[in-house]
Amino acid sequence: MRHGVAWALLVAAALGLGARGVRGAVALADFYPFGAERGDAVTPKQDDGGSGLRPLSVPFPFFGAEHSGLYVNNNGIISFLKEVSQFTPVAFPIAKDRCVVAAFWADVDNRRAGDVYYREATDPAMLRRATEDVRHYFPELLDFNATWVFVATWYRVTFFGGSSSSPVNTFQTVLITDGKLSFTIFNYESIVWTTGTHASSGGNATGLGGIAAQAGFNAGDGQRYFSIPGSRTADMAEVETTTNVGVPGRWAFRIDDAQVRVGGCGHTTSVCLALRPCLNGGKCIDDCVTGNPSYTCSCLSGFTGRRCHLDVNECASQPCQNGGTCTHGINSFRCQCPAGFGGPTCETAQSPCDTKECQHGGQCQVENGSAVCVCQAGYTGAACEMDVDDCSPDPCLNGGSCVDLVGNYTCLCAEPFKGLRCETGDHPVPDACLSAPCHNGGTCVDADQGYVCECPEGFMGLDCRERVPDDCECRNGGRCLGANTTLCQCPLGFFGLLCEFEITAMPCNMNTQCPDGGYCMEHGGSYLCVCHTDHNASHSLPSPCDSDPCFNGGSCDAHDDSYTCECPRGFHGKHCEKARPHLCSSGPCRNGGTCKEAGGEYHCSCPYRFTGRHCEIGKPDSCASGPCHNGGTCFHYIGKYKCDCPPGFSGRHCEIAPSPCFRSPCVNGGTCEDRDTDFFCHCQAGYMGRRCQAEVDCGPPEEVKHATLRFNGTRLGAVALYACDRGYSLSAPSRIRVCQPHGVWSEPPQCLEIDECRSQPCLHGGSCQDRVAGYLCLCSTGYEGAHCELERDECRAHPCRNGGSCRNLPGAYVCRCPAGFVGVHCETEVDACDSSPCQHGGRCESGGGAYLCVCPESFFGYHCETVSDPCFSSPCGGRGYCLASNGSHSCTCKVGYTGEDCAKELFPPTALKMERVEESGVSISWNPPNGPAARQMLDGYAVTYVSSDGSYRRTDFVDRTRSSHQLQALAAGRAYNISVFSVKRNSNNKNDISRPAVLLARTRPRPVEGFEVTNVTASTISVQWALHRIRHATVSGVRVSIRHPEALRDQATDVDRSVDRFTFRALLPGKRYTIQLTTLSGLRGEEHPTESLATAPTHVWTRPLPPANLTAARVTATSAHVVWDAPTPGSLLEAYVINVTTSQSTKSRYVPNGKLASYTVRDLLPGRRYQLSVIAVQSTELGPQHSEPAHLYIITSPRDGADRRWHQGGHHPRVLKNRPPPARLPELRLLNDHSAPETPTQPPRFSELVDGRGRVSARFGGSPSKAATVRSQPTASAQLENMEEAPKRVSLALQLPEHGSKDIGNVPGNCSENPCQNGGTCVPGADAHSCDCGPGFKGRRCELACIKVSRPCTRLFSETKAFPVWEGGVCHHVYKRVYRVHQDICFKESCESTSLKKTPNRKQSKSQTLEKS
């Protein structure tokens, strides 16, 4: 019995408290962190505004679809696909893609108070909290790990219509996802208002009443949704006391799937399964308040209450407008609209004219509540469907026949009668009033030419048939001649369309004479003559020629209303007013003829052999053949002629037609104007076109907004009539437009809306709103109706609660309450236990309008009507779920328990760790559960591994004897959630599992591809690699590392995956480095980053430093001696490469001496420019490594000016040096080329200047077979002229004598013994002498005779460098590049000593000879 009572008490507590089992709210400290200090963005302070579209960094799943953006709306709602600015909430479900998550959808106004914050969050603290919340509220998802959170917070916001001192609410929406599953959490701190004060919401000044806030979420398909209980009712003011997760003010849902899943603790007894308390299709939700089970009913649309037992009164929000009466239905309402309004909520103003159709341009008007058609002239009938017979009675006189027209008639008169009614003729007409032509009481007055009808007030027209419209605009006493037109009959002295112009002088009273005494008629300020029948009609108006406008005897020719003058000879001008100039001034006489004038003519006196009027005929007569056409006159000249063309023609033979206007192309009185090769016609009034051939046509007139249009034509004088639509009136300037002479219509009218509120139709203080063709009365409190003429029904506000019905009384109402409720408004609930509903001795307890039966032992149910089952005593406890079957029970154990009644705890493995990580696999190990008993229960382990994006999931079963496992076939660089469970097999094929031991592991990513070294300098090494778009999809970065052999560790740098190259800088020259690359997957610590296997070590030597301070120490005509800084001690250099480059070729010398600091380049040509490059070579295990070249530019000395000598008698020569500074290039010139020769012819010059050692020091132009002899010692530089044939080769240089009597034979280093052999020239020095050898000899004393022997050899040309590297036929691989082979001729030098041979002495001569060497 104790168990039954305990269970009943729990159920009683659940039913008594419902969703409000625990009072309270979520404190701000328990909200997810928010605010500006957290980096939140804030929505604009705008009524019904929001954040606009906010792109998301990860897609968010919602009802089976992924969304990449969302909107944070100020009105308490997060929406996908589109922004939601609607402020009055709509009951879920909603269609039309309204995908929304609404914590509190209401009319929020953040302009008055509060802020709306929002942000994305991926920081570890937020993700950890979100993960813990989801795992707690959804215990079946213990492997869930949040990767993204979105937080939106409405902080201290008030309602529309409120102020800064109005009540404020604070609530929050949290979105959570791991990329596959998604959840939302609602947090409510303080909810004190529910509704805005807008008319459609209906809230009061405190933010309560009307249509309250909606909470929940909606899929947007009109079917799938969830509404938090109490949505759109007054219960939303206490939503902070409700929950579905055991925390008052907090709701949690999973929202990624096609079906809604509601959160719960999952460890309490289900009240919903036991009682099923929700009615009318409401969904029951178990709350998990520890020790106090309760439930919440989520009602279908149209129902409310704790158990969804109350039908929502949709009329409470007063949806019917304009005085409509609301009738309540189930989840619906219907509005009965008053007269003049329609639509679902009586929102549309209606008029009797909406269904009335008037024909033939008739206008509908409302008169006394009915629609009446006001017809256009000529039509009648209820719908203007009948044409008025204007010929009844017959208005035509004197036997004329009447033809009926629309709104008019015309008379076909018999001879000799005419006039509008055939009233004019040759015979006296009887009294025209005898036929009583005037209608509607009009008085007929007989006139000379007929009759005139004087119409009574309200009528007009020729016969008083037409009713005067209310808006007749005729001025100065004018009468309107037709309805809906502005045609005025003006009184005497006025004219114009509206009789607006006064005639100051009557034209017919100013002695105006009409031809043959015709009758004068005033017309528009002018006059017209009505001629007698037998008078010529052309005299009805004066002729333009009547004033004799042509002078000097010119004749006038009239053309309609214009004229032209034909002038006599000698005059011209429009009126023949101008005299022509002297006839002879134009020189008409040809061929030297003399012109004489007489009597207005001229005469030509022709010279000999010419005749003719203009002396144009000669012999022979060229005009005899008649070459001039079109009447041209031929003038004869000697052997030729010229045509004098008549007016209008031109050309050599007058063959060119006249000007365009010559043929008078303009018709209908148009005036022609010549325009180059074309003409232009100035047309008379009423005509248009290129030749004035068409009458003026204005085309159809344009439409005017809010007006209908009628027009009688498009020609000159045609009239267009505009009639404003119902609800609009004419403003300016006129309703009539006239087709004007220049082919356009006159200014159009305007139709402006009529203010129907001007008459103040609303009664009892109601305010009037103007509408098109109508008005709307907004009634004051207590009145209603179209004009606020009715007193309001107090029951319309639905004051009765809990389903009570209202009865209206004069100035009051009374509520009839349903069973269970009493009070003035049925607000008090009666004791539900009065009916004794409990069976089998159950005790009834009431509360909150409901009751609960506390059942005795062995009975349960809502009324204790059901016999107890085996699960009543909860044999499975809180460790499993009990299932009854055939009087027995079975337990389905929860995670961590096993055994028959789930009484044994199943322990998980411990010390789960990672042993090895590879690209496609992971090795893990663990320890079995502690204790022999715990191990005895085990049947094995379940190893589950799931990829972080959920795309891969697998579970392996591992035998109990093993404590490690290899996870295979994994993707490279991918993160996996690994869970290991202890497993106990059951006989019912359902295994019990322990809580998991979890581990997050990531496989190694793939290494880079295509790694290579792209460039090496003395201080940098550049490398590049490639990442494949698919194979390296999980790679987030690349780590490049380098190590010097003497360094203790690598120097590593991480670069982004988008980078594919890197340069190591600040390296030491000539050193060996080791380079390796690895890829990285996952950068942050929480992502468990891994690194790929490194690439194979790549050894790279940096280049050695190039030679420093390269300079030219000495430059001669054929050699250059260069020096540079010696290598530092310990240098690994093994050789140098010297490149000699001209503009045509490059030669290289390989010098295998790494300690070299100078080098002499020989075999150069005098006066040439060279580029010298020196490259240092270092030997490595990878082959020779070369430095960058050091460059030097030189110009060799010319022959003359390098070394100058003069040989005199027995004295030894003294060499004068002309050596330039080492840093400058030599600039050698011909010594004696400064003065011009004495004779005009330049004498031949020598071709070479040879020094004492037989070396060419300068080359010049000249004859190669000539020589110059210098006869005496020059006082200045010798001028080498007077070239002679030389009998033999002489190798001498210019020599100068020694000065003084000093004995130079004993000077050290002198040349007194002439030690040089083979013609070598001795050069004395300070301490020693040197020999300057001739061609073909070498050695210190020129003792070696050398010859060069050619032989074929192979030269290698670099594909990347332009210069081959070779020395004496031996190729040196200076660059580690690809070479191509080229066959060439090389020279090998062979030398032989001549010391045993006697060298002939040189013969001294008093004269010195210079010869080509």
UniProtKB/Swiss-Prot annotation:
GO term, biological process aspect, one: cell-matrix adhesion
Annotated Pfam families: EGF, fn3, hEGF, NIDO
PROSITE patterns: ASX_HYDROXYL, EGF_1, EGF_2, EGF_3, EGF_CA, FN3, NIDO, SUSHI
Post-translational modification: Phosphorylated on serine and threonine residues.
Positions of the UniProt region annotated as Disordered: 1206-1226, 1394-1413
EGF-like domain: residues covered: 268-309, 311-347, 349-385, 387-423, 429-465, 468-500, 541-577, 580-616, 619-655, 657-693, 753-789, 791-827, 829-865, 867-903, 1307-1343
Positions annotated as glycosylated: 145, 204, 292, 368, 408, 484, 536, 712, 886, 977, 1015, 1109, 1139, 1310
GO molecular function, one term: Notch binding
Domain Sushi: 696-753
Span of domain Follistatin-like: 352-374, 507-530
Compositional bias per record (Basic residues), positions renumbered to this chain: 1207-1217
Entry's localization field: Secreted, Extracellular space, Extracellular matrix
Residues in NIDO domain copies: 103-258
The Fibronectin type-III domain, residue ranges: 908-1006, 1007-1105, 1106-1200
Segment forming the signal sequence: 1-24
The protein's name: Sushi, nidogen and EGF-like domain-containing protein 1
Organism: Homo sapiens (Human)
Gene: SNED1
